Every structure is written in C-alpha cells, then in structure tokens.
Amino acid sequence: MTTLACRKLAPHPESPRHQHAGPWLVWLHGLLGSGQDWLPVAQLCGDYPSLLIDLPGHGQSVSLSADGFADISRQLSQTLQANGIREYWLAGYSLGGRIAIYHACYGRHHGLQGLLVEGGNLGLENAELRQARLQQDRQWAQRFRQEPLPQVLDDWYQQAVFADLDPQQREQLVLLRADNHGLAVAEMLEATSLGHQPWLLPALQRLNVPYTYLCGDRDHKFLQLAQQYRLPLHTLARAGHNAHRANPGAFAAQVLAFLSQSSCLPPSSLSR
C-alpha cells in the first residue's frame, strides 16, 4: 500500500468538532507546491480537521511516483484509509484540482462529502488538442530534467496563466519553488499531463455530492472556462490563478460558506 506524506491539523480547541471525528478537509496542492501551501487557509478553516497532502514527486513525497490519474487516486484513497479518515471534503488547486475532480468522478471515494476546485482544468475535448498538450508538457519535462531549476522556473512563471504576477511576485515564487527536484517534477508533469487526462465535465455534472469552483477575479482563463461550462463559480477578489495564496482570508471564507451551505442541502439539491 502506497501512502502519501501528509500533515494533520486538529480543529481549534474551541471548535465543537475538537472532540469529535467529523468530516475532514483534505487539501491537494498544485505542481511545484506542497501541502504546506495550504497551511494559511487550513488554519483559517480551523473549525475542521485538515489533512495537508504532499502529492507524488513533491515535498516529503518526493521519492514517490505515480502512473497517471488512476494511480494517484488510489494513493489518495490509501492515504485517507491509513489516517483513519472516513468522511471528508476534498479541495484541490490547479493540478490538485484536476486530481480532485478525477478522484471524485472515478476513484474510490466512499465518505466524500463534497468537492472544492480552484483553477482546475476539466481536460481537452479532442485527440488533436490532447496530443499537442502532451508534446508541450514533454518539452517542459525535458527542461526540468536537464536545465538548472531556477532558470526553468523563471520561464515557467512567465506563462500566460500567471500574467497577474508582478516581477517581485515571480521572483518570490521562483525562490520558493527552487527546492523542488527537477527529475521528480518532470515525471509528475508527464504522468498528469492534460493530454492523459480524461474529459471530466460529463462525470462532474453527474456527481451526487456538492461541488464548487473557486477562481481569482484576475484569472481570465479559468474564469472563462467556469462560465463556458456553467460551473458553480465563486470568485476571489485581488487574485489571479493562485487565489488561495494571494487572498487566503477571502478563500477560507468562501470555503466555510460553501461547507455551511452544502451541509444544509437536501440530497436532491446536491451539486447545484
């Protein structure tokens, strides 16, 4: 059984859940990140116990690998089981959001209470687009394997999806992510390429648990995606693609509002 490295956060002592094993918040980070990225938001959601997971090739899971989305979903299920988590809300950002959607749609997700996705791509609708993305991701992976990591990261954060970042913010991210291992990042990037990901929208629309889509108001690509596919969208002010980093207070408030609202919904109202 493969289990991912993770960190547990207990609820605040004054929380009514402190003495009870209620639903957990399980957090999945993006490419180049770690579970620690979620710490500010998780602490602000301190009425709930949290599990901050390091995905394969990242953080304390750097020595672990994954053979695609189904394998990562299995690792996630095994990690939850090993930590005694029976009921949980699953939240994911970017790559973590894509993994979260896949797990909710196709994985062993007994006990899943709901889904929170930040800037996660639903996939590509045709083979031509998937093949082009595979080629693009292979080129990035080759750079992560062969070139100095700060040099690759500097170019990585010049991509259009990070257009809201100013030079100082880009420099901070390059420094923050420079402790990654290029070979491990390359392997994970290829294993989870959008070219390998199934088109998730139809399965997402059939979910029988509530879900929401969170997006920074400056993240034009994913705002358009959410609007195009009529996802249940909540926007975060003064934030781009990484909204939980830019505005953790507003992000946590949206999470708590969604959990509160969803916990009161009758089964017939779920997901909408």
Curated annotation (Swiss-Prot):
Entry-linked SUPFAM superfamilies: alpha/beta-Hydrolases (SSF53474)
GO terms assigned for molecular function: 2-succinyl-6-hydroxy-2,4-cyclohexadiene-1-carboxylate synthase activity
Keywords: Lyase, Menaquinone biosynthesis
Domain of life: Bacteria
GO biological process, one term: menaquinone biosynthetic process
Enzyme class name: lyase
Gene3D superfamilies: alpha/beta hydrolase
InterPro entries the UniProt entry points to: AB_hydrolase_1, AB_hydrolase_fold, SHCHC_synthase_MenH
UniProt cross-references to Pfam families, sorted A to Z: Abhydrolase_6
Pathway: Quinol/quinone metabolism; 1,4-dihydroxy-2-naphthoate biosynthesis; 1,4-dihydroxy-2-naphthoate from chorismate: step 3/7; Quinol/quinone metabolism; menaquinone biosynthesis
EC number per UniProt: 4.2.99.20
Sequence intervals crossing the membrane: none
Stated family: Belongs to the AB hydrolase superfamily. MenH family.
NCBIfam families in UniProt: menH_SHCHC (TIGR03695), PRK11126.1 (NF008340)
Subunit text: Monomer.
Job of this protein: Catalyzes a proton abstraction reaction that results in 2,5-elimination of pyruvate from 2-succinyl-5-enolpyruvyl-6-hydroxy-3-cyclohexene-1-carboxylate (SEPHCHC) and the formation of 2-succinyl-6-hydroxy-2,4-cyclohexadiene-1-carboxylate (SHCHC).
Stated name of the protein: 2-succinyl-6-hydroxy-2,4-cyclohexadiene-1-carboxylate synthase
Name of the gene this protein is made from: menH
